[in-house]
């Protein structure tokens, strides 16, 4: 009787633990369902928008246990695009992103907390050779089956970073000290 009870208990624990594992997703950049955008004020008159065209990443998602979720993203900083070739060249220089020395930026989450219907994703952003904690406010846009037999989940996130925190000290004026991040990703569940 004790062996049967022990076996049942172990089997139950294994089954329960296995079903609580967060699903892993790969960001769908091939289908153009993911964007890492930013905006910064230009002389207090308007917004300058830009994007990073080359990035990759994964995330795990467990709606019932968000604290177990993880996010990992790598961005090719040379892929910055603001729709102006000369400005993009300047952004790639040592005055800003210094892509020759730091060709990648990375974000690795350290915690995920559910706040109402949003997720606060805190992690380490490494940019221009500096690593600082950053919190993104994310919202689940939807999840479910796709037409090709797979599963997908989509999120939008926003956050802000201060340029000086990442050793970008070029004087752009008082209105241009922070960059707003606007991120939209759709992930394909991995099997």
UniProtKB/Swiss-Prot annotation:
It is found in: Periplasm. Gene3D superfamilies: Lipid/polyisoprenoid-binding, YceI-like. GO terms for cellular component: periplasmic space. Residues 1-22 form the signal peptide. InterPro entries: Lipid/polyisoprenoid-bd_YceI, TTHA0802/YceI-like_sf, UPF0312/YceI. Its main location: periplasm. Keywords: Periplasm, Signal. Transmembrane segments: none annotated. Pfam families: YceI. It comes from the Bacteria. Belongs to the UPF0312 family. Type 1 subfamily. This is Protein YceI.
